[in-house]
């Protein structure tokens, strides 16, 4: 069973290249964080990716356990990098850079290399965050169709199952498939990027053909990774389930999730009661 997602919370979009952000031209006056992405096997960086010697380097390491069907007996990690001025748009990374500089044995060295470790971050999501910091959007871009007066995702369409292509990721920490934009939203919450939260919510509303199981696992992820006073993403899922209730009430996954319980389903009960009250008020006003 599938449900469509609804377009919500408009936000201004900035122009971006659809290519990888590591190809961006950066003024030499900006301090540089290496823009290589590679498997973490040593402290070295490929020669072609080495920055100018007079610029300092920052690197961000993420890690996750390699799947068992892969032929690697060790934990896989990836090295990301970015320019300091760009990274510090995020209050989280600005504070992390300050701490890293303070802890560096030679903070004034022009050739220093400072690492920021994010062991709990999914590499695919951090890639979206960095791309947004450089480009104001992340792939696929949200494009405004002036003819139809609607927003669209660039170069996307339904797959063989009718679901928007590349709408989901497998989240290794939870062991479930979730909507990528939900993970980006939660990461933006963590890193203090309010415009990115609005962008991720809008892009999530442009997907279609999403499985009920994916919506429910994404909703649980949203509840687990946002504060209790968060009013956008959580409300989006509650409204979606209520709007598509005829589909969800036939879903075996919905039954299993409700039996597990959690704050999501109490909020859903309250939202459903409010919805019924609104319908009753609207009906009485027409009488």
Give short role names for the model-derived ranges.
Residues 118, 169-173:
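Intrinsically disordered, low-complexity acidic/Ser/Thr-rich segments used as protein-protein interaction/activation
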């Amino acid at each position: 069973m599938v449900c469509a997602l609804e377009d919500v919370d408009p936000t201004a979009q900035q122009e971006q290249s659809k290519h990888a952000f590591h190809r961006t031209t950066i003024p030499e006056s900006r301090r540089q964080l290496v823009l290589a992405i590679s498997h973490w096997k040593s402290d070295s960086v490929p020669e072609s990716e080495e920055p100018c010697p007079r610029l300092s380097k920052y690197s961000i390491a993420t890690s996750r356990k390699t799947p068992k069907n892969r032929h690697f007996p060790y934990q896989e990690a990836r090295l990301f990098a970015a320019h300091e001025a760009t990274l510090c748009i995020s209050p989280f990374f600005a504070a992390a850079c300050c701490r890293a500089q303070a802890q560096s044995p030679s903070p004034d060295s022009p050739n220093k290399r400072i690492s920021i470790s994010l062991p709990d971050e999914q590499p695919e999501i951090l890639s979206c965050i960095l791309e947004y910091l450089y480009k104001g959007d992340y792939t696929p871009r949200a494009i405004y169709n002036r003819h139809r007066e609607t927003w669209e995702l660039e170069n996307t369409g339904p797959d063989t199952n009718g679901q928007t292509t590349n709408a989901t990721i497998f989240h290794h920490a939870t062991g479930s498939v979730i909507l990528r934009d939900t993970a980006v939203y939660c990461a933006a919450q963590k890193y203090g990027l309010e415009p990115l939260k609005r962008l991720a919510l809008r892009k999530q509303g442009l997907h279609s053909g999403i499985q009920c199981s994916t919506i429910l696992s994404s909703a649980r992820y949203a509840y687990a990774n946002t504060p209790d006073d968060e009013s956008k993403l959580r409300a989006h899922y509650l409204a979606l389930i209520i709007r598509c209730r005829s589909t969800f009430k036939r879903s075996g996954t919905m039954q299993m999730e409700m039996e597990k319980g959690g704050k999501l389903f109490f909020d859903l009960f309250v939202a459903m009661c409010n919805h019924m009250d609104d319908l009753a008020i609207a009906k009485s006003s027409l009488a």
